Amino acid sequence: MSELNTNPITDLNRYNLSMSKSLIDKIFFMDKIDDTIKVIVDYGCADGTLIRFLAPLFPEMIFIGYDKNEEMISRAAAANTYENCVFYANPYEFITWLKEHRYGIDECALNISSIIHEVYSYSTKEEIEDFWHFVNYTGFKYIIIRDMCLDENAHRASLKEDLIKVKSNYSAAAIQEFEQEHGSICDNYNLIHFLLKYRYKDNWQREVKENYLPCSTEYIASQIGASYSLEYYDHNILPFLANVVKRDFDITIKDYTHVKFIYKLKG
């Protein structure tokens, strides 16, 4: 595994709270999948906040949470009060559950929310290949993706006035740490990366090393197999992010930062 695993999340409660702030945006897919879907598999479910939010709203559906962090899964299971939620620390254990409860994989949708960038930050090359194999070849009817992501053309010179605003209002040492890991913020791609990251001061030693933007929009699209067709696509800036960056630096982010894909199995 990556050396980043030597920098664990120092405050799981704060981490989970941060992740839950975009909860409404994360459930964008629920009105876009057809009624043959009986099971949602939430890959990288953390403490289960997302599916515990959905479970009472859709009592006829099953929500399965997976996270390789066993402490997260323990928290999720301990907090769960819904019979239509189950949690696993192995991504393939749910297949046994499906067979035991007589659900087909073609009745399942895979939700991958804010996970792809973590896979690339914390995994070996082989583990990344295994991840995409799981995504493409398990047989899910839908693959749902939401993550931080920029277009390839975001690599361009940063605006001089934006650089001045950042360097005048943030720790020079922290900026230097970021640039040592990810490159100069004179590249607009890296500047936006920094603006996605700067707020996480409590977990900074972990967060500064994590690559939030390892994959461009175009790259992610290229990783989905030919057996799936694109059903939905959206690329935007989260209003919360735009507002907080404007407040803290008086900078208007001009590139879309969060992408959503829904792919459907052909045939």
Indicate residue ranges for each PLM-predicted region.
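Conserved S-adenosyl-L-methionine
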Residues: 56-62
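A conserved beta-strand element that flanks and buttresses the S-adenosyl-L-methionine
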Residues: 111
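Hydrophobic adenine-recognition pocket in adenosine-nucleotide-binding enzymes
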Residues: 115
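Class I (Rossmann-like) S-adenosyl-L-methionine-dependent methyltransferase catalytic domain
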Residues: 1-55, 66-84, 88-95, 138-267
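Short amphipathic alpha-helix with an adjacent loop that forms part of the alpha/beta core around
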Residues: 94-105
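Active-site catalytic pocket residues across diverse enzymes, especially alpha/beta-hydrolases
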Residues: 58, 80, 123
